[in-house]
């Protein structure tokens, strides 16, 4: 199925809406250059969440495939995709250690 529009669900600290998510991003990534890079990657994911995936990481708790996308050498976005319902779940954004726990 090809999705014309993707719905984003932000689950970084429990489920939050877009406004709360942007606030969370600004608090956690106050450097304007890094914040801009994160927003650019999210925009690319909005076009096609599979195209820029760095690696497949198994499945989320709903059974959807999980991926990561590289923002910088150390910063990753961990997300999953429900292609049947055109939903992208954002699970975590942070350092390699924070995202992967290692």
Predicted feature descriptions by range:
Residues 1-74, 82-89, 93-102:
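Basic, Lys/Arg-enriched alpha-helical interface segments
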